[in-house]
Regions:
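Short, well-structured beta-strand/strand-turn elements
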Residues: 138-156, 253-254
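Loop/turn elements at helix/coil->beta-strand transitions in domains of secreted/extracellular proteins
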Residues: 110-112, 144-146, 191-192, 276-278
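Zn2+-dependent metallopeptidase catalytic core
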Residues: 119-147
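Conserved catalytic/binding loops enriched for acidic/polar residues
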Residues: 256-301
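Flexible loop/turn segments at secondary-structure boundaries
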Residues: 121-124, 156-159, 177-178, 201-207, ...
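Solvent-exposed, acidic/flexible segments
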Residues: 121-128, 132, 229-237, 274
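Auxiliary tRNA-acceptor-end handling modules of aminoacyl-tRNA synthetases
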Residues: 1-120, 138, 153-206, 211-228, ...
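Active-site recognition of the HExxH zinc-binding catalytic motif
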Residues: 133-136, 190, 234, 238-253
Length: 301
């Protein structure tokens, strides 16, 4: 928490911790627990006498992995990929710590199928599909076809979205207002086995909050409390481009926006051709360097 508030230790509370559910799937079993712990915290280096309690939901999964392992690749910090750590114990005198790249094993016969929550409204589904289509254009150029496939939750009674080994895009009915994505990875190789993407109910809250103070002076669409669904869908498409990138093993690339100069970001010709950042893995959602009058000239916002 910015270095001011630090968790020193946690003491599990067995009386208020319990097993919530146990599920069996085709190739794995999952146990979900509600775990409560008392925290010892320090504020600016001083240990507090208060011990607040924290309750979290923890899912533990045992999966049957394929005997055929994907070839590993050593991670390099100069390349924008995700990674997992490993320790090589084969040398008894000196252990070796290293990092594997996290990546998908994508072929024309092995697409990446995402099952999307049927609670997500149709306009948002179209925005998400647009993001998948943008990625598929790249794969088509590589001769892999269109490997990212979006399907609605199956109506079959055997389908369960909480299966940790399938790719899902879920509608999150919580206080979060950001799109989230996390991968389930084969720790032996770094192969990404599945991805869970969450689309929050309160996405409009984030769009409005960031849009008002970054874009209200430039774009009249943000000068209202109720943001138009069209604007939310544009924002969702940009967020999902990054989420799909994370699901493929790419890392956040905050240097993407540093590649363009302020002059370029105010140029209609440049922004229409190259967009507002050099990487979809950036966190930039708005062209907040634009000035009043730039939109009318054709600058992409």
């Amino acid at each position: 928490y910015g270095g001011m508030l630090t968790i020193v230790s946690a003491s599990p509370q067995s009386k208020t911790s319990f097993v919530d559910s146990a599920d069996a799937f085709d190739n794995c079993i999952s146990i979900t627990q509600n775990c409560t712990a008392k925290l010892s915290i320090s504020i600016m280096g001083f240990v507090s006498k208060e011990q607040p309690e924290l309750t979290m939901s923890v899912q533990t999964t045992l999966a049957l992995l394929s005997k055929e392992k994907m070839n590993t690749r050593e991670a390099n910090p100069r390349v924008g990929t995700g990674y997992i750590s490993y320790t090589d114990y084969r040398n008894e005198k000196r252990f070796k710590k290293g990092y594997y790249v996290t990546r998908r094993n994508i072929t024309t016969q092995q697409p990446v199928v995402f099952y999307i929550d049927t609670l997500i409204q149709d306009s948002w589904v179209k925005a998400i599909q647009k993001s998948a289509d943008e990625w598929n254009i790249i794969f088509e150029d590589l001769g892999i076809g269109k490997p990212i496939i979006i399907k609605p939750y199956e109506k079959d009674s055997t389908f369960r979205a909480n299966n940790p080994m399938i790719n899902t895009i879920a509608f999150l009915n919580n206080n979060n207002s950001e799109v989230t994505a996390y991968n389930v990875t084969d720790l032996r190789t770094g192969e990404i086995l599945s991805t869970k993407i969450g689309v929050p109910r309160d996405l409009a809250v984030s769009v409005r909050r960031n849009g008002v103070y970054q874009m209200a002076e430039i774009d009249p669409r943000f000068r209202t409390y109720y943001i138009a669904d069209e604007v939310i869908c544009e924002n969702l498409t940009a967020r999902m481009l990054k989420a799909f990138g994370l699901s493929l093993g790419l890392a956040t690339n905050l240097a993407g926006s540093a590649a363009y100069s302020p002059e370029e970001l105010r140029s209609p010709e440049f922004t229409q051709k190259y967009g507002i950042t050099a990487s979809v893995m950036d966190n930039v959602l708005y062209n907040y360097l634009a000035q009043p009058g730039d939109k009318e000239k054709g600058v992409v916002l």
